Amino acid sequence: MKGNVKAIRQMLAAGFCMLMLHGVTTYAAEAFQLTSPGVPDGGTLASIHAGSQNDCGGRNVTPALQWRNAPTGTRSFAITIFDPDGAKGLGVVHWVMYGIPASTTSLAAGGEPPTGALMGLNVSGQAAYRGPCPPAGEIPHHYVVQIYALDLAPDSLPAGLTRDALHAAIKNHVLANTSVVMRFGR
């Protein structure tokens, strides 16, 4: 009898482990993911993506982005690029875009926003991408590219939101978010 109980416990433990392993691999395979082709997470942005101001040598070309496995119920996306190292640690907003249709799963480098998408305001108060331009000689800055899957229709938000205003507007509408970090220095 004791042998049978021990064998049953071992089978139950093995079965539980298999279920857990299946659940973890299923979750990992279905996680909302963001990548930038050619730039691994933690990698360095090419100089073309840098700002054109202050002799940074760039052309303000947005990085290419791809995402997959948005959660069920996603109606639109929002993307921000934020440099937490900029402005002496207070941070710098480089890009705000929202109202991106749920059918969109990528943005080409330097490409036009998808039809209907809106540009928010960057650190300069412009509705545009502003490429990185950290002070010369500083350690490379980190640029957090974050995408939010939203339950909002693409046309739900007004044009010209700042990053803070966008965060306030989507606070109760984020289904999931994911990010990658890129670096740039000069």
Where are these regions (language model features)?
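N-terminus-centered regions that define maturation/targeting leaders and the start
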Residues: 27-186
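Bacterial N-terminal signal peptides
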Residues: 11-23
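Bacterial N-terminal signal peptides that target proteins for export
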Residues: 2-13
